[in-house]
Amino acid sequence: MLAEVLAAAGVLAGTWQSGPPLPVARTEVAGAVVGGEIYIVGGYLADGRSSSRVDVYSPQTRRWRRAPDLPVAVNHAMAAAHRGRLYVVGGYSTTGTLRTTYALANRRWRRLAPMPAPRAAAGAAVAAGRLYIVGGVRQSGVLARVAFAFDLRRLRWTTVAGPTPREHLAAAALGGKVYAVAGRLGGINSNQTLVESLTPGARSWTAVPPLPESRGGTGAAAAGGRLVSVGGEGPGGTIASVFAYDPGAPRWERLPDLPTPRHGLAVVGIGPRVYVIAGGPRPGLFVSGANESLDVGD
């Protein structure tokens, strides 16, 4: 019956599943997948302090474990993975907006070349052997107008074309392209529906069909061959809606709503399943350890 109702409403069928919660609830975290495991990095704690904690979730065993703490406590940082290494870039610390680049391999953090300029509340994605940092802010309230690309073989940063400036956006790689999804210009009344893509090496971003609903403080991931946009916050509170974009269509389709609406959340994809972990259940400084996943199909 539920599947029929969802189909009639233009919602793709699927059922959210709950996993064991993040051991320490946080919001404004960074997340990435390394070797089939999900790494959750930093974020705000319930008391407003930033965290350096790194927790690792195995969907196969449904268990959490600790990884070495990040060398600095951060919130609004960006994370991505490539060939068994976790990269954590930028974010806010007690000293301001960071330029830092850290890589974790063999349970040891290594500090790499810093970004050309500070970044926080941006999106991160890996495509064509480069880690892209798109959007975000140079410092609180100052939108970034260019993006950065980190060559993962030469370990060097370059400046590349940026998407339309906005912060608290999401980024993901799909089909060899980098996508910049939604975000906002400042406060939660400035949320955007804008979605753009970049082909590595191109000099400009291309607009793709916009999201059906604006959102900031959102997350996105590639799963099941589609780009999945999850959650966020707006003037009415946290956002439950979930949409999937098929580049071959090209159009957005509605998926089942997120059971625990959140902003500042980690969204990652493993195969056809999207995982949504941590975040704030209400706008502002509220924390959650929720761990929910959805099979979006192939």
Name each region found by the language model.
Residues L6-D298:
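Kelch-like beta-propeller repeat domains
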Residues M1-V5:
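Bacterial N-terminal signal peptides that target proteins for export
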